[in-house]
Each structure stands twice: as C-alpha cells, then as structure tokens.
Amino acid sequence: MDARATIHDYYDSLRHGAPLDTFFADDRPEDDAVVKCGVSERLVGADSVKQGLRDQTASTSDWAVDSRDLRVTQRDTVAWFSDDVGLAWDEGGQRHEFDTRWSGTLEHRAGDWSFVGLHVSVATDL
C-alpha cells in the first residue's frame, strides 16, 4: 500500500467509526515526535494521540469526510499531503460541520505507512 492509499483508508475508517489509532506511528525511544492537531485539540506523543483517537471514536458517530483536493508526494520512506475536506460528525446529540484543511506527514516503517504528523484546521476567510 502506498501513502495515498493509507490516507484514503484513514478517511474510510473515520467514516465507518473504525479504530484510527493504528494509523499513527509509535514514538521512537529517542523522541516524542508524533503530533496530531485537530479542530479543537493538539495531541503530542504517540500514546496521547492514540488515546485521543480512541476517545474520539467512542464519543462521535455518523462522520462525513468529503476529500476535495488530495495532493500527496511520496519518497522512499517519507510522504506528505494536503487536502481540502468537508467534515461533519455527530457528538452528544449535536451535528458539527466544517470546511477543513488537512496536512500531514507519513513515514514508512516496518512495511507500513504511518502518520507521524496530522494537522486539521477550520478553513475560514478573514
């Protein structure tokens, strides 16, 4: 599987309420470098990111993920991407909908592509 397919699988897993923590790399012993910034949080370190994603999966449902402009560059062991994503979900009886911008970095480790950085922000005009 290449980096683009991994990103598409992540989007599909989000849509279907499947676990997302497995898409993120484990920290290497020498660093605490895995980072995920979402619409309302910043998680640092693989353990924090993975727990945050498990909590998100447990507390949300009915995700809509509309990828509008996915761009991926892949090299031997690193890839980076950006996308414009229509994002919506249910949480606590309330529907949340945003136009978002995504960017991230994946690393090829042990035969798989894993996120080492993911940033999701709300797209607004100033």
Model-identified regions with their sequence ranges:
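Short, aromatic-enriched amphipathic alpha-helices that serve as compact interaction elements
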Residues: 1-19
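A solvent-exposed, acidic/Ser-Thr-rich amphipathic alpha-helical stretch
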Residues: 21-70
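Hydrophobic residues on conserved beta-strands that form the core of alpha/beta folds
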Residues: 65-67, 82, 115
